[in-house]
Amino acid sequence: MRSERRSTKTPERVTQRNGYRRRGWETRVGEIELEIPKLRQGTYYPEWLLEPRRPAEKALVNVIQEAYVSGVSTRKMEKVVRELGVKGLDKSKVSRMTKALNEEVEAFQNRPLDKRCVYVWLDALYPKVRQNHRIVSQAFVIALGVDETGHRTILGFQVGAAESEAFWVEFLRSLVKRGLRGVQLVISDAHEGLKKAIAKVLNGASWQRCRVHFMRNVLAHVPKGDKELVAAYIRTIFAQPDREAAGQQLDKVVEELAPRWPKAAELLQEAEHDLLAYMRYPRAHWKRLSSSNPLERLIREIRRRTEVVQIFPDEGSLIRLAGAILMEINDEWAVGRRYFSEKSMQPLF
């Protein structure tokens, strides 16, 4: 709309403003009252006012509402509610919104996995959740994959005991039941329960130990003043052009470290095969296969977008909000560029 003076006439002007109609627009920072122009001829209505909230936005508002209605809010929570523009916290309205969001997230969580998935990353984040009148850190585990076309996809997510082999077996079996197949390499941290579950459920897949987590574990056994030197030694292993050369360099580094840092040398020797598993795959993929960093970035994004909640009222609200965020990210990946090029994927088949 052009804001011409009332008496101005121009050749481009095909109609005239004839007052306004008021419309409330609910935003994350509150409700804004808009004055939408009425026309003498024709109609005008801004299309962006008709756009529904994105799933993660709806889920965030819902979690805040649910916490508030359940009586677990604090002064800070009340402030957040006001900033989100939430008014009229009616329990039946919250219940209806919760049901709709649950169905949407559950459908995504249980959808069929119809493409072969070559690489899988597994990791967890630990947000705070109310449980039996206590506040506990609850594991929210995520499985990220790269399918046969080179695109990333969210394979699944769940709340559970991330240190338990039984939990991981159940989680991985649920992925297989939905169609997960063709897995050649799984990348994760060295949780014993997880390693055993991978061997049991994804039989035939290799396991890559996260290089970043391994480095932290090794350096924990090295005096502060020597950490950078030891890290530099270890990095020379990963700079080698192939698996054979990396193995030879690892042996040399172990010999160098053993006299002064025997525990670090021992850990490095024991981890050789799991630490260098990624080098059996296309070189163009090495950087992303050597660690859990692709999933760590995803976890940071979830943390960033859920930090306003701070404490989830229950497990369901955690799954609802984190699941909605993952849905949005997965949709963006589906239409975005490939994570690995089609050409670089060809040697795997």
Give residue ranges: language-model regions.
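Alpha-helix N-cap/N′ positions at the starts of helices
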Residues: A56-L60, L229
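Acidic/histidine-rich catalytic cores and adjacent linkers
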Residues: E4-R5, T236-F349
